[in-house]
From Swiss-Prot:
Encoding gene (name): murB
Protein's name according to its UniProt entry: UDP-N-acetylenolpyruvoylglucosamine reductase
Lineage: Bacteria, Bacillati, Bacillota, Clostridia, Lachnospirales
Keyword Cell division: yes
EC number(s) reported in the record: 1.3.1.98
Cofactors that this protein relies on: FAD
PROSITE patterns xrefs: FAD_PCMH (PS51387)
Location in the cell: Cytoplasm
Ranges for domain FAD-binding PCMH-type: 31-208
Active-site residues, as the UniProt record annotates them: 187, 237 (proton donor), 307
Organism: Agathobacter rectalis (strain ATCC 33656 / DSM 3377 / JCM 17463 / KCTC 5835 / VPI 0990)
Length: 314
């Protein structure tokens, strides 16, 4: 235990609710992961101070969103883990004004905290009869995570509607970064390499009849239920889409449907997903991923790159 850090937090941020030895399986959709030394979900008023305290104690800081694209090692994460959650989950709809550089005819803006669930933002947009985020209606991740990885599905991506993001820099300064400056591409942004922490994002949307928006969103959700293994914990798509191929089909054609290591399994419903059938360990998932990569490379000459982010000690 880092007594200096705990004492500082207790005295200066008494309402924070700092947790010690917090199981990370409680904070990932994979339901896998060992303990974080310290875990907290600060709001906007506390996050900068908390990071400052951790740095003063030479403590590493890891920031996560909804944990929907993470595999945390069985030995957990050293230092402080900051969960961007309910304290940063506000969603606000406004109409763009003429002096706003984003303004277009009938353009509206949704501002969402990084902890807001992307699907909830899409639902809020639909209720306001605003189109552009339909593709996100079934994405379980947070706004912050979606910006970091330029989340997308069914032909839509965050970069299609993002205006800018407010971030906390590695120096502890608030900064607004435009979509172009974020250098968004397939499952990529400059956020990790710059050491930014996304605090909020603004999206540009356009009016459309509410029933049309909701009908299309319902159609996409039905496709997800039909094709994806939502009945089991997972981290979503395990591998990035290799150019010219589909990861799931390559894995299926390699004869790996249902392949298991412990309770980690290549989904029988969609081979692009690795699922946790019960008590899978991170080591099981890691071994399975490597086995799949080796088999697909050997059979088809295609190197699969993991989409799931691996953090912590394995």
């Amino acid at each position: 235990m880092n007594q200096t850090f705990v004492k500082s937090v207790t005295e200066q941020l008494p309402q924070l609710g700092l947790l010690q030895d917090e199981p990370m399986k409680k904070h990932t959709t994979f339901r896998i992961g060992g303990p974080a030394d310290y875990y907290a979900e600060p709001d906007m008023s506390r996050i900068s101070k908390l990071i400052e305290m951790a740095k003063a104690c030479d403590m590493p800081v890891t920031v996560i969103g909804n944990g929907s694209n993470l595999l945390v090692g069985d030995k957990g994460i050293r230092g402080l883990v900051i969960g961007i959650g309910k304290g940063l989950s506000e969603i606000e709809v406004t109409e763009a004004v003429a002096q706003d550089f984003t303004a277009q005819d009938n353009c509206h803006i949704i501002t969402a905290g990084a902890g807001a669930i992307l699907a909830a933002v899409a639902a809020k947009a639909a209720e306001a009869s605003l189109s552009g985020l339909e593709f996100a209606s079934g994405i379980p991740g947070s706004v912050g995570g979606a910006v970091v990885m330029n989340a997308g599905a069914y032909g839509g991506e965050i970069k299609d509607v993002l205006i800018d993001a407010t971030v906390l820099t590695a120096d502890g300064e608030l900064k607004t970064v435009t979509r172009d400056e974020l250098d968004l591409s397939y499952r990529h942004s400059i956020v990790p390499e710059k050491g930014y922490i996304v605090l909020s994002a603004r999206f540009r949307l356009t009016p459309k009849p509410k029933d049309e928006i909701k009908s299309y969103m319902a159609e996409l959700r039905a496709k997800r239920v039909e094709k994806q293994p939502l009945e089991y914990p997972s981290a979503g798509s395990t591998f990035k889409r290799p150019e010219g191929y589909f990861a799931g089909k390559l894995i299926m054609d390699a004869g790996l449907r249902g392949y298991s290591v412990g309770d980690a399994q290549v989904s029988e419903k969609h081979c692009g997903f690795v699922v946790n059938k019960g008590e899978a360990a991170a080591a099981d998932v890691l071994t399975l991923i490597k086995d799949v990569q080796e088999t697909v490379l050997k059979q088809f000459g295609v190197k699969l790159e993991p989409e799931v982010k691996m953090i912590g000690e394995f």
